[in-house]
């Protein structure tokens, strides 16, 4: 069994002798980690993540519309979202492998045009299953998937000292998309209909994502001999790389099954309570705007204490906020609880990427980060469908919230065990 250890990463810069990454192409001079170019690259990556993230949230906004359009139940109306998320997960892993081999530019040049095509095709569908398939293949797998896991992994290669905050910033694009797109879609659907809105999104994705993607042509040159050294890393973890990866995958699924209940169903939930879908869209935007703040804050915390402790903190706060949904369903209280939920859970998913970078070599970043982050997407997909199915069985969302809390407790147990295992190994080495 190979023991996973924390170690120095990258190759030394010649002029300073400081360990780090060197970024270059044959026609360009090397760029050290945390350079001004890396920060400009981060800005472009954030824009791509925000635009591409529309593929994750569009099906949430039109959930009540799909229910009425195709005559399906709440569980059936949740399936297009689930299909998009499953496609998103599969595509993330495949595109992550492609990025490891060819750089992020090739996946991005695939993503923009096909995401736009996916929205146009979805607008032209005439049956429920056509819509589900388009959501899964074009919107999820070939479109939006590139703008999450693979893009986060690419950004992690360009930073060392500020990796935590950099990863948090680009991962915030997913939540910025959730804060921006639902309100835009809700308004445009009310004016022109969902099909015309989808066509407009498709055109917008193509004309913005392609030029932004071209800004990321330059590749990072990395030395993949060892993992990154985390701020809190001071010893080995006595588990094989396969075991570490597997544990993180299960934990990511569990946390996001819990996370999906409010995110996927808050609009439908507000409709059931009589507040209307527009109020639900506002709550979703508030939740995800608070999530952006959470992601940035957790990135700063992780830069000081490491990914695992920050991950446990966020998971515990998410569980507590889910409990708050049970006794409170008034309009004002739902706004407050949704804001608390966003602040609690926003930083969880990016910390999985940081933990992966703490344990695995940079040359494996695209594949391994994408695998864990896409596992979180699978959790969102399962949880979104599961909550709808529980609603169909019980007629309310109370049992769905309890289901989310149970999955959240499983996540806390797994990550706590992983941290305790590392601490025990460190104590053994000290003796």
Residue ranges with predicted function:
Residues 169-220:
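Helix-loop-helix hairpin linking two adjacent transmembrane segments in secondary transporters
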Residues 50, 118, 130-146, 253, ...:
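Hydrophobic core of transmembrane alpha-helices in multi-pass small-molecule transporters
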Residues 40-74, 95, 181-182, 261-267:
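Extracytoplasmic
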Residues 66-67, 98-99, 180-192, 270-271, ...:
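Interfacial helix-cap and linker-helix signal at transmembrane-aqueous boundaries
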Residues 106-120, 309-324:
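Structural signature of the two symmetry-related core transmembrane helices
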Residues 59-63, 243-299:
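Extracytoplasmic gate region of multi-pass secondary transporters
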Residues 90-129, 302:
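Conserved MFS/SLC helix-loop-helix module at the cytosolic interface between two early adjacent transmembrane helices
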Residues 135-172:
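Cytoplasmic helix-loop-helix junction between adjacent transmembrane helices
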């Amino acid at each position: 069994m190979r023991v996973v250890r924390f170690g120095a990463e990258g190759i030394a810069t010649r002029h300073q002798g400081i360990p780090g990454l060197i970024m270059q192409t044959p026609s360009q001079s090397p760029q050290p980690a945390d350079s001004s170019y890396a920060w400009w690259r981060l800005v472009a990556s954030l824009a791509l993540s925000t635009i591409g993230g529309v593929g994750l949230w569009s099906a949430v906004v039109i959930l009540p519309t799909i229910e009425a359009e195709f005559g399906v139940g709440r569980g059936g109306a949740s399936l297009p979202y689930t299909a998009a998320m499953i496609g998103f997960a599969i595509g993330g892993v495949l595109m992550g492998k492609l990025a490891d081999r060819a750089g992020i530019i090739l996946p991005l040049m695939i993503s923009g045009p096909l995401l736009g095509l996916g929205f146009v095709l979805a607008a032209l569908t005439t049956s429920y299953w056509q819509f589900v398939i388009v959501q899964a293949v074009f919107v999820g797998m070939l479109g939006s998937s590139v703008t999450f896991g693979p893009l986060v992994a690419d950004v992690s290669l360009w930073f060392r000292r500020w990796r935590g905050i950099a990863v948090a910033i680009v991962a915030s694009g997913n939540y910025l998309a959730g804060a921006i797109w639902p309100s835009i879609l809700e308004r445009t659907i009310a004016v022109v209909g969902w099909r015309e809105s989808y066509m407009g999104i498709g055109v917008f994705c193509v004309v913005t994502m392609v030029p932004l993607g071209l800004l990321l042509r330059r590749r990072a040159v990395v030395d993949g001999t060892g993992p990154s050294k985390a701020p809190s890393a001071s010893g080995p973890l006595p588990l094989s790389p396969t075991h570490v990866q597997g544990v993180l995958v299960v934990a990511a699924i569990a946390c996001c099954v819990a996370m999906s209940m409010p995110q996927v169903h808050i609009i439908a939930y507000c409709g059931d309570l009589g507040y209307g879908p527009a109020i639900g869209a506002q709550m979703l935007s508030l939740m995800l705007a608070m999530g952006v703040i959470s992601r940035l804050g957790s990135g700063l915390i992780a830069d000081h204490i490491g990914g695992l402790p920050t991950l446990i903190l966020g998971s515990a706060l998410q569980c507590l906020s889910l409990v708050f949904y049970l006794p409170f369903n008034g309009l004002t209280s739902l706004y407050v609880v949704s804001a608390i939920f966003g602040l609690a859970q926003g930083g969880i998913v990016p910390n999985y990427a940081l933990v992966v970078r703490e344990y695995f070599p940079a040359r494996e970043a695209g594949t391994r980060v994408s695998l864990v982050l896409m596992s979180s997407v699978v959790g969102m997909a399962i949880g979104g469908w599961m909550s709808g199915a529980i609603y169909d069985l019980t007629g309310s969302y109370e049992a769905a919230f309890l289901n989310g809390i149970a999955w959240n407790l499983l996540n806390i147990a797994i990550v706590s065990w992983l941290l305790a295992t590392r601490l025990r190994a460190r104590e053994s080495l000290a003796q």
